[in-house]
Amino acid sequence: MTSRRVKATIIVAAWRAEDTLSRSVRSALAQDIGSLEVIVVDDASPDGTSRATRELMAVDPRVRLLTLDRNGGPSAARNAAIEAARGEWLAVLDSDDQMQPERLLRMITFAESVGADCVYDDLQPVDPEGRPLGSSHLAALAINSPQKWPIERFLTGCRALPGQAALGYLKPVLRRSFVMQNGLRYDTNLRNGEDFHLIAELLAVGGELWFLPTPGYLYTHRDGSISRRLNPDHARALLHADKAFCARHVDTLSAEARRLMRQRDRNFADLAAAEIAIRAIKSGKLLRATGTLLRRPSAAIRMFRQIRGGLARRRAV
């Protein structure tokens, strides 16, 4: 592989992934893209994640394994893979998700035809057995053709609005030369929402982002998924990262982009307060819940929506 040009590097950050990794990596190896490599980064897993990866390596030399000495989260794992990658394009794949076989060929061919630095496609939620769950993530937007997304469009879809199909869940395919030339890396302080900040940074430094409406990424929906409910500590980290982003690009962000970031921050602050209040109620700490909502009344509406949504999901089971 070292003597051949590698078209794509598929990055799989893995933690406690021994039960799901094989299917994910096999979907990566099945990509009809020619020369590729799959880099699995074992994020100091306490299980057999590394062993499962070595079993895959024994069957297919395109699989590579990196191991981290201590758990650093998905950002640290992906950054390690970016440094080691040889592909012209970088594709992010979670260790319990899959891709349709033609996904990367379609996305990279399109990206090269328009000069994109990053391309998204839609994702299809599936159950742990790979069965589709409803419509695709962005089906309600009724996008029928490729779209170029400037930073304002991207931020519009990442405001943490109740019921919003957030663009931050989409998985990017990135031009590695642009990533390296601009020093783009995942924020290792984030355990949630790290993809948003990478793409926001790419756009802020002049990168070109396109969206393809075909759902080629299969997102596994699991109870207790980290992206299902937001830990208040993670929300605070996101707010800090948002403020740092705006400060870095204060001279280049448009007035509309700054307005959207302020709205995003208000919504995340509401979400964090609502989560704190819900946890307090569940623990029987009603005074703490009341105090949290009195300090941020706008979070009360968010809390009641979350409770109503949780009850609706229970009735549906």
Describe each PLM feature range.
Residues 1-233, 311-314:
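Nucleotide-sugar donor-binding/catalytic module of glycosyltransferases
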Residues 3, 197, 204, 209-317:
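C-terminal subregions of glycosyltransferases and related glycan-biosynthesis enzymes
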